């Protein structure tokens, strides 16, 4: 927080940052001009092949639907017949952004999501209000994982419930609570959970166990199985269960330890001066042998499963 306060300032003014870079003995100074920085919600969009488009959406903000519409239009102009929508590790964001994005895919008048809580005021319904930009015969695959939450789950789950897309990956986070912010004074606010999100099949996005059911009266759905618009069976255990589950690969102890201790990043920083551009890098046997030697020379603390606990007990 202290660093952020020092960096912030009037737009157009200068600030000098001193940076300690890996393998550099002295600090490096950068003089920066303060400006409003706009971070795009779509980190990448393009054609994977002659038919399949790909869009990576990293969050849901005020501009998400505009960026999505522009990306879809460009892909459709390239004769896209199938789309991969990547929502992996997307933590969510604004509900309205999720609803507006669903408008681009779902027929006008369809129920998209609704909220239920203890009071009548907390009950709201959201329907598609426009003719979809994306043709109904265009195949859609949505990628999700355990890092997909909130608005990501609304988009993935609604597309799944309305049989508009196939969901692939890992079960999502399960964050489906509506929170209302009450300002206490100029510097403080109180955030209270007031309702839960439900998607078209009637499924609750929130995973059980996070919030006692008696806090939000009459909102608990006991059924664990629900059905899509076309009659497909889907799980209602919280979060979004993919139509096709992808198993996580299990890494070796040395691979896991190398990743945790930053050896991949450190190796790249050490050798990046050997190349003029990324295109020059070739993952051949030479570079793999060099990396292997680098790992073994790094004196890693590597333990088999349960070994560290055993050693701790032995030293007691």
Language model features with spans:
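Cleft-lining beta-strand/loop regions that shape enzyme active-site pockets
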Residues: 1-185
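A broadly conserved detector of short glycine/acidic/proline-rich loop/turn motifs that flank catalytic sites
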Residues: 36, 58-59, 118, 146, ...
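Polar, glycine-rich mid-to-C-terminal structural blocks
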Residues: 151, 157, 163-164, 168-170, ...
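Conserved functional hotspot residues or short segments at active or partner-binding sites
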Residues: 204-316
């Amino acid at each position: 927080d202290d660093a952020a306060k020092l960096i912030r300032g009037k737009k157009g003014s200068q600030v000098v940052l001193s940076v300690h870079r890996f393998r550099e003995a002295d600090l490096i100074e950068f003089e920066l001009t303060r400006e409003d920085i706009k971070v795009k919600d779509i980190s990448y969009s393009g054609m994977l092949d002659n038919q399949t488009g790909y869009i990576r959406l990293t969050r849901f903000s005020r501009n998400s639907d505009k960026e999505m519409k522009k990306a879809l239009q460009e892909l459709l102009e390239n004769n896209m017949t199938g789309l991969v929508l990547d929502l992996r590790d997307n933590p969510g964001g604004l509900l309205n952004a999720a609803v507006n994005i669903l408008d681009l895919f779902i027929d006008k008048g369809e129920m998209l999501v609704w909220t239920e809580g203890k009071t009548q005021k907390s009950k709201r319904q959201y329907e598609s209000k426009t003719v979809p930009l994306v043709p109904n015969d265009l195949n859609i695959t949505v990628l999700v994982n355990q890092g997909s939450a909130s608005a990501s789950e609304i988009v993935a789950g609604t597309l799944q419930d309305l049989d508009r897309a196939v969901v692939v990956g890992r079960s999502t986070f399960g964050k489906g609570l509506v929170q209302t912010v009450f300002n206490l004074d100029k510097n403080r606010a109180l955030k209270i959970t007031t309702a839960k999100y439900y998607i078209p099949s009637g499924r609750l996005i929130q995973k059980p166990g996070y919030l006692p059911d008696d806090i939000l009266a009459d909102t608990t759905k006991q059924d664990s199985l629900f059905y899509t618009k076309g009659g497909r069976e889907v799980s209602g255990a919280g979060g979004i269960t993919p139509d096709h589950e992808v198993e996580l690969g299990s890494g070796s102890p040395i691979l896991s330890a190398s990743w945790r201790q930053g050896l991949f990043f450190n190796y790249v920083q050490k050798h990046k001066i050997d190349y003029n551009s990324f295109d020059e890098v070739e993952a051949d046997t030479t570079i793999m042998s060099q990396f292997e030697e680098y790992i073994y020379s790094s004196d890693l603390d590597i333990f088999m499963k349960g070994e560290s606990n055993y050693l701790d007990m032995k030293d007691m």
